[in-house]
Amino acid sequence: MDNAENSSLYGLFQESLTDDNLFMIGTSVDTERGNIYFNVPWDQLVKVQEMRSIDNIFIVGSILKLMFDGINKEADLKLCTNVVHNNVKLEKALNAWKSITQFPGKVYPTINEYEEALKHDKIFDNLKATSSKIRKRGQNPADAEINDVLRYRVTCERIGTHSFESPEAARIIGGELQDKYHWLVDLSTYHLEIICKIIKNEIVTQLRITHESKHHRNIMHFGPTTLRATICYNLLRLAHPNPGDIIIDPMCGSGSIPIEGGLAYENSYMLCGDNHTKAVLRSKSNINISCPKSKVDLTQWSVSYLPLLNSSIDIVVTDMPFGKRSGKISDNRVLYKEFLLQLGRVVKPITGRLVLLTYDRRSFHLALQRAGNLFRVTKMLGVNVGGLHAAVYVLKRTKIEYK
């Protein structure tokens, strides 16, 4: 069983992820806030890794029920120890993890191999202490040597009320796994991270496949509010692009949306722009690096008057100023109105679609009122963007003529 996680998405926006998974692997899924679960055969694992809508991928090693006392910490932690010792069988998941990540080292070292590796571990620790480029989330397992003993860490996440804290559970479970598999504990340069999710009276053990989040792609030159690539893909997917569609991002910032569009929808044409010269230069650099051969064009313009023909655009996907980290809410009240009216002019009636991300709901609703009957809201979805509870509005251009 695989677990695909997107910590930025929740609520109705998760529908897009579910659709993506059904499209990619043709299997049913179970969802919970920020997570989707599905069973997948070995020959479909590559497709899972190709999914553009998810941040992290895990293999679910075991799901076990426990009966915590809820009061006696020592008894509850002992229960965790016993369950890991007697019931947690990770061999199948470990073999899958080794194959997927291409880890060449020793997943099942002998006690002698462990003790020999432990002797050299102090030297390795000294090297880590003097290095200034240690990764915050482990290292790429594929970069290990054939004789390397597996380095690991255990992270515990809890939902519900328990008699113990998450670090205490992680320490107990991690120690038991070390006794069981003879791995080296390493909290910073580990090959494998094991996530133990304790949800009320259930413990779910997961092995991380992605040593870094999949949203870290495409962008080399970041702006103050660069959007995650995974969110960009889901925004684009909500617009249902067709071959030949002209898609614009009028507020492209660092170019995250048009780059993702150019890579994911190569048969569509992407046009993007921004009014800030620095943003245009950043976008140009990122486009040249990430998708130089894609159908992505860039220009500098003002969204108050877009240099585009009437009824010429099929899709608009953009990240509007939030009024928090970029722009001001007082400015948004004017900007949003002018922007929506321009979109009413350039977007094709009846077939045109808009997917707009914003934190400033009030300014957006006022702008919608000003736009009159030019648009119809078909869906409003929630998305967490850097801790801000933003909204995605999916709009359809009506047949009303722009005047």
Question: For each of these PLM feature ranges, what is it?
Answer:
Residues 1-24, 29-44, 139-140, 159-172, ...:
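Class I S-adenosyl-L-methionine-dependent methyltransferase catalytic core
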Residues 1-187:
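Non-catalytic nucleic-acid substrate-recognition regions in nucleic-acid-modifying enzymes
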